[in-house]
């Protein structure tokens, strides 16, 4: 593994110096190549699907794993979108002149080698490779073994493009070891790897966070909340809540707990129940919720659970303070929303809720790099350092200081 990582590190020194025009050209060629090789990728994907079915993997996981012409086209389009983004490398963030004549510039630079650990979605392979490349980084990717054949096919297509352009193919690499031991070895290699981004289940995140010698930006669970304030537009609150739960229930920005102000519970809960049941959502409520609608009783465990399914917990709260306290206790720092027509209540919620993305009168489903205008994303960070929220190419850079002098010495 050290030899693989050494080559990736060497490649990162080349990618760091590429200008935006070259990077855009390569990304467009990578997009073309994915589409031209779609039959090959689909054939390899069938091997992964066979493994998934033989090992009784969940329907949701198999859906994330599945590739067809349309999905490969979307992967190619994502690379084209990345190619349209402004190159962050070399951008001057700040600059000033000292009294002694030294001119200082704070300039964006690539991080170096980024290790990304993720599970069954092969589209992450091309997205991550594209984002890392556009931001001047090299990447070492560790996908799940259930997507092994698909990932190898995708990476080989991308590497061929680099080679044809006389660039180091190792700038886009797969970790050769798919085992947990392979992950452990990767996260010990702080000599070669500059940042680790784990995307996946709670156990994976915990394992990486506790064992890594390399700095980690976590993409942890999304235990998202919507609080329906006493001054909410009821119809809007129902519409937003249904969207946040059912549009894609298996993703990290779907809502898991609904907090309802006590003063509007009788008006809103029956409407919520009717609309959620139309969508096949199982509701679980606190004692006060059960006084209004007949649903399953929620337990303490429910407030801590990211369902990733058509299940929603409902808690009636006394006021804004209790809603915020609940989010502070059980939230994961991902995305939380308030539905209200009251400006001061919305500002208090925005300022006090300490999550990466805090909304007013909108669905939590918008927490996404594409929706935010970042192009694709490598994930959604629940860290406070080094990046937070959807991570686009800007978040895959750091900075250095360039100091221009004309003979100054320190007295």
From Swiss-Prot:
InterPro entries: Ald_DH/histidinol_DH, Ald_DH_C, Ald_DH_N, Aldehyde_DH_dom, G-glutamylP_reductase_CS, Glu-5-SA_DH, GPR_dom. The keyword S-adenosyl-L-methionine does not apply. One of its GO terms (molecular function) is glutamate-5-semialdehyde dehydrogenase activity. One of its GO terms (biological process) is L-proline biosynthetic process. GO terms for cellular component: cytoplasm. It is found in: Cytoplasm. It comes from the Bacteria. It catalyses: L-glutamate 5-semialdehyde + phosphate + NADP(+) = L-glutamyl 5-phosphate + NADPH + H(+). Its EC number is 1.2.1.41. Its main location: cytoplasm. Keywords: Amino-acid biosynthesis, Cytoplasm, NADP, Oxidoreductase, Proline biosynthesis. Pathway: Amino-acid biosynthesis; L-proline biosynthesis; L-glutamate 5-semialdehyde from L-glutamate: step 2/2. Belongs to the gamma-glutamyl phosphate reductase family. Catalyzes the NADPH-dependent reduction of L-glutamate 5-phosphate into L-glutamate 5-semialdehyde and phosphate. The product spontaneously undergoes cyclization to form 1-pyrroline-5-carboxylate. This is Gamma-glutamyl phosphate reductase. The lineage of its organism: Bacteria, Pseudomonadati, Campylobacterota, Epsilonproteobacteria, Nautiliales.
């Amino acid at each position: 593994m050290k030899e693989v990582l050494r080559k990736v590190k060497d490649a990162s020194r080349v990618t760091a110096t590429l200008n935006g025009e070259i990077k855009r050209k390569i990304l467009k060629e990578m997009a073309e190549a994915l589409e031209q090789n779609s039959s090959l990728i689909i054939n390899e994907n069938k091997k992964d699907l066979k493994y998934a079915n033989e090992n009784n993997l969940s329907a949701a996981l198999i859906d994330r794993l599945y590739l067809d012409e349309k999905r490969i086209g979307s992967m190619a389009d994502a690379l084209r979108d990345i190619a349209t983004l402004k190159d962050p490398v070399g951008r001057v963030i700040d600059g000033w002149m000292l009294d002694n004549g030294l001119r200082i510039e704070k300039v964006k630079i690539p991080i170096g080698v980024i290790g990304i650990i993720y599970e069954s979605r092969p589209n992450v392979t091309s997205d991550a490779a594209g984002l890392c490349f556009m931001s001047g980084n090299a990447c070492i990717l560790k996908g799940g073994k259930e997507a092994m054949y698909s990932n190898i096919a995708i990476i080989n297509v991308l590497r061929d493009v680099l080679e044809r352009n006389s660039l180091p193919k190792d700038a886009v690499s797969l970790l050769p070891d798919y085992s947990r031991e392979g992950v452990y070895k990767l996260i010990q290699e702080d000599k070669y790897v500059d940042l680790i981004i784990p995307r996946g289940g709670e156990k994976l995140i915990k394992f990486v966070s506790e064992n890594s010698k390399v700095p980690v930006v976590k993409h942890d669970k999304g235990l998202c909340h919507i609080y329906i304030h006493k001054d909410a537009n009821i119809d809007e609150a129902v519409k937003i809540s249904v969207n946040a739960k059912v549009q894609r229930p298996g993703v990290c920005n779907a809502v898991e707990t609904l907090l309802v102000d006590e003063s509007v519970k009788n008006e809103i809960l029956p409407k919520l129940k009717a609309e959620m049941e139309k969508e096949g959502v199982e509701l679980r409520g606190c004692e006060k919720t059960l006084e209004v609608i007949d649903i399953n009783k929620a337990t303490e465990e429910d407030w801590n659970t990211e369902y990733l399914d058509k299940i929603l917990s409902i808690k009636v709260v006394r006021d804004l303070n209790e809603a915020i306290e609940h989010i502070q206790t059980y939230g994961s720092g991902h995305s939380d929303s308030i539905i209200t027509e009251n400006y001061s209540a919305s500002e208090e919620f925005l300022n006090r809720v300490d999550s990466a993305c805090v909304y007013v009168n909108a669905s939590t489903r918008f927490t996404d790099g594409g929706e935010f205008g970042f192009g694709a994303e490598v994930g959604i960070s629940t860290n406070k350092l080094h990046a937070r929220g959807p991570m686009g190419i800007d978040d895959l850079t750091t900075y250095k200081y360039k100091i221009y002098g004309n003979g100054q010495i320190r007295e």
